[in-house]
Amino acid sequence: MRLPREIGPIHFVGIGGIGMSGIAEVLCNLGYTVQGSDASESANVSRLREKGIQIHVGHKADNVAGADVLVVSTAIKRDNPELLAARAQRIPVVRRAEMLAELMRLKSCVAIAGTHGKTTTTSMVAALLDAGDFDPTVINGGIINAYGTNARLGAGDWMVVEADESDGTFLKLPADVAIVTNVDPEHLDHFKTFDAVQDAFRNFVENVPFYGFAVMCIDHPVVQALVGKIEDRRIITYGENPQADARLLELKPSGSGSTFKVAFRDRKAGTAHEIAELMLPMPGRHNALNATAAIAVAHELGLSDDTIRKALAAFGGVRRRFTKTGDWNGVTIIDDYGHHPVEIAAVLKAARQSTDGRVIAVVQPHRFTRLQSLFEEFCTCFNDADSVIVADVYPAGEAPIQGIDRDHFVLGLRAHGHRNVIPLQDSASLAGVVAGVAKSGDYVVCLGAGNITQWAYALPGELKALGG
């Protein structure tokens, strides 16, 4: 039995969230009656309203009146008035991943998981399948620039989804093709131990049916170890590793992107194939690896080399992934979602490869618990930055932790050898600080999962307003 067409209204609590909004949009496009609520107005809320979805700002028990089902994310607390009202009225309550799983049952699915790179890789798989006339349905964790949204309903038989591992519910997703980009210690508030994280990813891959396959990056030692433990599923490995089935070769920076080729090796058939002259309009080894995963899926699903080549060269990127927000006196301003040390290091390395000038990082640490648990890693991931400007921690609903704040982070960076670390008093001070440091040819990279994205978009205008 599949999701009945007559069910509805489907009420989303926190409908403006990036994961929730995509599912709501696809359900609406399928003809279901969708409604919801969110704590505040946002671009996602406005976009969904334009599609005719009724959205309340604020959470109230009355909002769920008439709903057939309530969809909640793990961010919704047990005492939320809408959740309490739904349970009191015996309205079924489902998690975001469960509703996503219901949508996935309608199609053949590619699900992209990993600690980092999910959103970009999901966008790349979607772009390649789109170019191959698959017309896929897509539900992503970020705004795909080519669509102007994070979701679209396609008429084809395939769906491409980002699989969020943060609360373990990605194990509910019925994927025919699974991608694992990497596995690092993250979301330990849910998993408790890194061993539990690894077990979850192993289960994610082993959930793939016997007729499907998984694409896994063996440049990452934890993923390589997982590959060795999975015996009864078809695995296509990728990476720069000489043992990879889809091997990234001859990676070179090229303008604001990179060029490379991918060599395929079919161990069972004993054959080899190479796709040369690939160009990706995004810098960084991490993005080339993400592209290699997408290329491996596209190649396996029968796309021609030329289609892959053209689609990759035309890839428009994802909002908040090395996004240029403007420039000032020859200084380029970049906005990036990177908030984990591995992501930050990769983004700064990409910036270093993209300019002959200096790299100035502006970081807004995201969550006190993350800064605490990965403090040493945070103090060593800025090596490709000439200067680091440190803002206050974005709490994301967390209570402060004594000794885990901006000033201690500044001291930690300095203790690890960083020569120019600047504490930022507030966002209004940013333009003045940047103007005093940056010169023509420099890249200013704003990093974080909080509201620093708003600073990044405002910064070019604020710098111009200062004159000079």
UniProtKB/Swiss-Prot annotation:
Subcellular location: Cytoplasm
Lineage: Bacteria, Pseudomonadati, Pseudomonadota, Alphaproteobacteria, Hyphomicrobiales
HAMAP family: MurC
Pathway where this protein functions: Cell wall biogenesis; peptidoglycan biosynthesis
Known catalytic reactions: UDP-N-acetyl-alpha-D-muramate + L-alanine + ATP = UDP-N-acetyl-alpha-D-muramoyl-L-alanine + ADP + phosphate + H(+)
Pfam families for this protein: Mur_ligase, Mur_ligase_C, Mur_ligase_M
Function: Cell wall formation.
SUPFAM superfamilies: MurCD N-terminal domain, MurD-like peptide ligases, catalytic domain, MurD-like peptide ligases, peptide-binding domain
PANTHER family in the record: UDP-N-ACETYLMURAMATE--L-ALANINE LIGASE (PTHR43445:SF3), UDP-N-ACETYLMURAMATE--L-ALANINE LIGASE-RELATED (PTHR43445)
Family: Belongs to the MurCDEF family.
One Gene Ontology MF term: UDP-N-acetylmuramate-L-alanine ligase activity
Keyword entries, A-Z: ATP-binding, Cell cycle, Cell division, Cell shape, Cell wall biogenesis/degradation, Cytoplasm, Ligase, Nucleotide-binding, Peptidoglycan synthesis
Signal peptide bounds: none
Binding-site list for ATP: G114, T115, H116, G117, K118, T119, T120
Name listed for the protein in its UniProt record: UDP-N-acetylmuramate--L-alanine ligase
GO cellular component, one term: cytoplasm
UniProt keyword Transmembrane, yes or no: no
Biological processes per GO annotation: cell division; cell wall organization; peptidoglycan biosynthetic process; regulation of cell shape
E.C. no: 6.3.2.8
